[in-house]
Amino acid sequence: DIVMTQAAFSNPVTLGTSASFSCRSSKSLQQSKGITYLYWYLQKPGQSPQLLIYQMSNLASGVPDRFSGSGSGTDFTLRISRVEAEDVGVYYCANLQELPYTFGGGTKLEIK
C-alpha cells in the first residue's frame, strides 16, 4: 500500500497570512500520461471532508482561489494565500493513484 505522510500540526498562522501543508507519498502518484493522482481534502469541525484540490493542482468547484496545490511525484504542498477563520480544520492528502486508496493522517491548521 502507498503510505501518505503528513505532519500532525501546522505552524500557527495569523489570519490574513499564508499557510502551507506538506505531504509525502511512499511511491510516485504520477501516471505515464503525466496526471498526478494526489488529492487534498479539508474536514472542518463537525463536518464531512470536502474536496479542495484534485490531481495535485486543480481547484475543485466552489473552492476559493486562495487555495493552490503543487508538487512532484512524491512530495506535495497545499498553500492558502490568505488564511481566513473558515479555513480551520484538518487537511488531508490522499492517494487516488492505486488501490487501496490511502490518506495521510491529516494536518490541523492552527490559528494564532
UniProtKB/Swiss-Prot annotation:
GO BP annotations listed: adaptive immune response; immune response
Annotated stretches, region: Framework-4: 103-112
Pfam families according to UniProt: V-set
Residue segments, region Complementarity-determining-2: 55-61
Framework-2 as annotated region, ranges: 40-54
Domain of life: Eukaryota
Chain spans, region Complementarity-determining-3: 94-102
Region of interest: Complementarity-determining-1: 24-39
GO terms for cellular component: immunoglobulin complex
Chain intervals for the UniProt region annotation (Framework-3): 62-93
Any GO MF annotation of the entry: antigen binding
Cross-referenced InterPro entries: Ig-like_dom, Ig-like_dom_sf, Ig-like_fold, Ig_sub, Ig_V-set, IgV_Light_Chain
Annotated region (Framework-1), positions in chain: 1-23
Entry annotated with the keyword Cell inner membrane: no
Disulphide bridges, residue numbers: C23-C93
UniProtKB keywords: Adaptive immunity, Disulfide bond, Immunity, Immunoglobulin, Monoclonal antibody
Leftover remarks: This chain is from a hybridoma-derived monoclonal antibody against the streptococcal group A polysaccharide.
Protein name stated in the entry: Ig kappa chain V-II region 2S1.3
